[in-house]
Amino acid sequence: MKLNEIRERFIKFFVRNNHKQVFSSPLIPEHDPTLMFTNAGMVQFKNIFTGIQKTDIKRAVSSQKCLRVGGKHNDLENVGYTTRHHTFFEMLGNFSFGDYFKETAIEFAWKFITEELSLDKNRLSITIYHTDDKSYEIWRKVSGFSNDKIIRIATDDNFWSMGNIGPCGPCSEIFYDYAKPNLQNDDRIVEIWNLVFMEFNKDEEGNLQKLPKKCIDTGMGLERVAAVMQNVYDNYDIDLFSALISKSQEYCGNVENKAAHKIIADHLRAAAFLIAEGVLPGNEGRNYILRRLIRRAVRYIHQLGYNDPLLHRIFPVLIDSTSSAYMGGVYPELIRAKSLIETTLKSEEENFKDTLIKGINLLKKFTTDLKPGDTLSGESAFKLYDTYGFPLDITLDILKERKINFDQKGFDNAMEEQKERARAKWTGSGEKSIEQIWFNLIDKFGKTEFVGYEFSEVKDAKVLVILSSKNEVIDSAKEGEKITIILDKTPFYGESGGQVGDTGSFIIPSITPVLDTKIQKKNDRSCDRITEGIAIVENTNKVNDLYLHRCIVKSGSICKDDIVTASTDKERRQNLRRNHSATHLLHFALRKILGDHVTQKGSLIAPDRLRFDFSHNTQVTRDQLSLIEDMVNSLIRENLSAFTKIQSMNQAIGEGAMALFGKKYGDQVRVVNIGDSKELCGGTHVERTGEIGLFKIITECSIASGVRRIEALTGQEAIDYARDNEINLRKIAELVKAPVNEITSRLSILNQERKESETKIKSLYKKLVSAENIKSIEINGMNFVSHSFTDIPANIVREFTLQQQKPKTVIAFTAMEKNKTVLIVKVSKDLVDKISTKELVSTVTGGVCGENAELTQTGCDSSDIFTAIYSYLTR
């Protein structure tokens, strides 16, 4: 049975049993700073398991993309050398959120593997946690197994947890026996399914608390079960990897080196999925993990004797619908990102080639005298890593092949010394977990109804919650207080998708004071207002579907349950619309002019400007920028209609809509259509492109490896920018005494004249230096030459000093540079062993000096400097 068929059967089986199919979440976990990558199927349901997040879903089934490189689950070093380790893999899973528990979960698992997959139950065995008597009883009833086939395990192998903290519970594992006597036990018996009975949540101290609801989390490695179904005991012999490895062997040959081909296939697949989610090679965090994967694969390509970029040539196998390695159907992001993936892989291979060759040669040099069993020093490995950029894991791979040990402690010490030097500059990742308070509020009041697409003002919004500046719930706020307000509905756009939040005001009507003292409020926060209250909305954020209005009470007061008029700043809102729609047009133009490898990496939509970050490996030329700008302005002049549609995710992508790589969308998405531009977007937009008026690019630059940034203006801001440039041009024209259209030629002439003048001035200075009355005295058989140049630049004096080649001579000159005295000291080569200029100057000035033993230049106090040098030479 093929891998794709197994996945399909699994999903359909559980859908038939009333499970909702939930699509894979991104490899980059959302709102979870505890994980670098999604490493299990349950990650996207973590907040549901803990009770933080509420859901209407009772049962779910998924095929989840997973990556295990780093942290508790790190399989990188084992890849290629074992039969079952991967960096990227798919995890099939069924989940229950307070619905069914152990008995039903075990029944589902048994039915699927014995009926859907038709596995021989005599080849199966079960493990359970040693105290889990309930699971033992259920397995006995469902499977009919004897005691020796249901094994109790007392270790943590059968008590599952995601990490040091989080949901956990006892688990039951299903094993398959290949029953081949020529296999080692580790290869013969393989775990194929893990059923986790989520009952607890583990805190940072290791304490276990009962979860609000008992849940089920199961995980079946798709590659492992495919190996069982295809009767191969090495995962890399299944249909998917066979196709990738065949393509690798087609280019590289050397079929005997199986480990190298396995590593290439595994790392290529992992890298492709990361790039498809917008991760690009870099030197930190997830970007560095991607770089490690690509570079480790490149090292094995080089080992196979293939010296040209290769990964981008193998990648198309993953999106070839006729290939057994086809993954583009289930994961269409691979197809959408084809150009970006191929460009990134090729570029990274090309950039790493010289480093790889140099590093391998240096490692050979460091290990020339080492025999198997000897140890490479940690300092040498760190020098390769830190100075030459040679990855440590590649060093370890090569040492492993040569049976040379590695001084891990020495490497760690060198690394720690480097970290100490950089620690003062470290600022952390900046990631924050979602605060519990927002979950509690949305659970109590529900989502904020956003009406800002249709309205810029609503007159009947109800105040549901008021939070103090310390995020404490309060009943009311008075003049001068900074607060956060949550309404039942709002026209204010909450900052998201790169677009900043709306600003504006709340008008709170006056209330007749309560005269009956018997019903007077017990606290001092009164909701009685003789005059209307006004709250200024300074920003709006969106957190977990709650719209948070950050306000300051300008006058009067505001109270819980008040009915307010909520008004956005309409002019500012319109400017945001212009810039957001212009960003879509810019994205469209970039892909047309530069290629469809361009994808959005980030954006800022502010009322006065826009910023767009995108993937591209080279500088955008001036001609290309002009073409991009012209295309956007042409689309503006066409006055195209901008409209939105709510569609299913699959339908939107099928119609060519652009989505942000790595972002998880719901079943229904909002698509913004502007001409041929289609993007998934929740922002506010113009009704027609003509409202944008004008588009002007002001800067283009690199912000990271493979990522460029364009900043631009629209509307009146663009007009003002053009007008300011015109005014500046006219001023320049007046200064150079030329018409505006002749400024360039006039400046060229003036620049040439300036260079000629500088040459003449320099020549005159040299003559002045030579004409100075420079004194020389003899000290202990050497000449001491000193002079103070008061009107000659230091660079001229330095050049003159370097020209002096008289033996047994010490020269000390002072000159002026930017109104400061500069000391220049030179010692002839035959005196360098006796007198160092660095030591001499440090002694007489009291400072730390650089340069070299023969020549040193530094700032100094001009008074008595020559006397001090004389004393040093005669000591």
From Swiss-Prot:
Which reaction does this chain catalyze?
A: tRNA(Ala) + L-alanine + ATP = L-alanyl-tRNA(Ala) + AMP + diphosphate
Q: What residues bind Zn(2+), as annotated?
A: 580, 584, 681, 685
Co-factor binding comment: Binds 1 zinc ion per subunit.
**Primary location:** cytoplasm
The UniProt entry's GO biological process terms, in alphabetical order, are: alanyl-tRNA aminoacylation; negative regulation of DNA-templated transcription
Q: Kindly give the SUPFAM superfamilies that the UniProt entry links to this protein.
A: Class II aaRS and biotin synthetases (SSF55681), Putative anticodon-binding domain of alanyl-tRNA synthetase (AlaRS) (SSF101353), ThrRS/AlaRS common domain (SSF55186), Translation proteins (SSF50447)
What keywords are annotated for this sequence in UniProt?
Aminoacyl-tRNA synthetase, ATP-binding, Cytoplasm, Ligase, Metal-binding, Nucleotide-binding, Protein biosynthesis, RNA-binding, tRNA-binding, Zinc
GO cellular component assignments? cytosol
Q: Which InterPro entries does the protein's record reference?
A: aa-tRNA-synth_II/BPL/LPL, Ala-tRNA-lgiase_IIc, Ala-tRNA-ligase_IIc_anticod-bd, Ala-tRNA-synth_IIc_core, Ala-tRNA-synth_IIc_N, Ala-tRNA_ligase, Ala_tRNA_ligase_euk/bac, Thr/Ala-tRNA-synth_IIc_edit
Enzyme class per UniProt: ligase
Q: Which GO terms describe its molecular function?
A: alanine-tRNA ligase activity; aminoacyl-tRNA deacylase activity; ATP binding; tRNA binding; zinc ion binding
Enumerate the transmembrane spans: none
**Where does the record say this protein resides?**
Cytoplasm
Q: What is its EC number?
A: 6.1.1.7
| Cofactor section | Zn(2+)
Sorted alphabetically, which PROSITE patterns does this protein's record hold?
AA_TRNA_LIGASE_II_ALA
Q: What does this protein do?
A: Catalyzes the attachment of alanine to tRNA(Ala) in a two-step reaction: alanine is first activated by ATP to form Ala-AMP and then transferred to the acceptor end of tRNA(Ala). Also edits incorrectly charged Ser-tRNA(Ala) and Gly-tRNA(Ala) via its editing domain.
HAMAP family found in the cross-reference section:
Ala_tRNA_synth_B
The family annotation for this protein states: Belongs to the class-II aminoacyl-tRNA synthetase family.
Q: Regarding domains, what does the record say?
A: Consists of three domains; the N-terminal catalytic domain, the editing domain and the C-terminal C-Ala domain. The editing domain removes incorrectly charged amino acids, while the C-Ala domain, along with tRNA(Ala), serves as a bridge to cooperatively bring together the editing and aminoacylation centers thus stimulating deacylation of misacylated tRNAs.
Q: What is this protein called?
A: Alanine--tRNA ligase
Source organism per UniProt: Wolbachia sp. subsp. Brugia malayi (strain TRS)
Gene encoding the protein = alaS
